[in-house]
Regions:
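Conserved GNAT acetyl-CoA-binding A-motif
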Residues: 5-20, 160-172
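Functionally constrained cores in energy, signaling, and assembly domains
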Residues: 5-8, 67-68, 116-122, 169, ...
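Cytosolic ligand/metal-binding cores
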Residues: 23
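Active-site/acyl-donor-binding loops of N-acyltransferases
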Residues: 28-53, 139-149, 153-200
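Amide-forming acyltransferase catalytic core, primarily the GNAT-like/NAT-type
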Residues: 31-148, 152-154
Length: 200
């Protein structure tokens, strides 16, 4: 309550959080506004993609794709990529400037991962976060339309043989040859509450 009073006195229009449990915050007028799409993929998914795409997939993996971990000096490029291609996708979003992506790089490195950049013919076509602290986790992949295969080829290059991959924040279920998307789910993640209505 004190935190909300402080935010009201600062004329903050709203506040948000990732709740430990909805029941704790619902009585204080917090409501979910974002559901994160999640899926867990195993060797069968990556093998099926290779089989399904065959020569096209091999061409992507060996010739077209160049991917690497982002460095601090890439943060501005990442912010510009997101602003130019994805800023219209969200109603409410954290300010994704160079400082945001520098912080993301450090956070992912603390979990034995990083921010991955995927290029096609020197053009940035995809960015995503990954962590390897407890198995491979892919977070919030953002790729240009038609570049999904480059993203998956990059992920395939990061994982160990037979390693399961958890993916968080996909825009849509992956193109799966056998149409097996039962592991694809949406989990409520972010709650929001209006604090100072006049500031909205």
């Amino acid at each position: 309550i004190h935190a909300l009073q402080d935010q009201y006195s600062q004329k903050m229009p709203f506040t948000f959080l990732m709740p430990a449990a909805e029941a704790i915050y619902h009585p204080y007028d917090f409501r979910f506004v974002y559901e994160q799409k999640q899926i867990e993929l195993d060797e069968a998914f990556f093998s099926a993609r290779k089989e399904y795409k065959n020569d096209e997939y091999r061409n992507i993996s060996q010739e077209r794709i160049v991917d690497r971990d982002a460095r601090f000096m890439d943060a501005g490029k990442m912010a510009a990529f997101v602003e130019e291609n994805f800023s219209d996708c969200w109603n409410v979003v954290a300010l994704r400037n160079a400082q945001y992506y520098q912080t993301q790089i450090l956070e992912q490195q603390s979990e034995f991962g990083g921010m991955r950049l995927v290029f096609e013919e020197e053009k940035l076509v995809c960015i995503y976060a990954y962590a390897k602290e407890e198995g491979l986790e892919i977070r919030e992949p953002l790729y240009l339309e038609g570049k999904e295969d480059l993203f998956w080829a990059s992920v395939d290059g990061l994982r160990e043989p037979e390693e399961k991959v958890s993916v968080y924040g996909l825009k849509e279920a992956p193109d799966w040859p056998d149409d097996e998307t039962s592991a694809y789910k949406e989990k409520p993640l972010i709650m929001i509450r209006i604090v100072h209505l006049q500031e909205l």
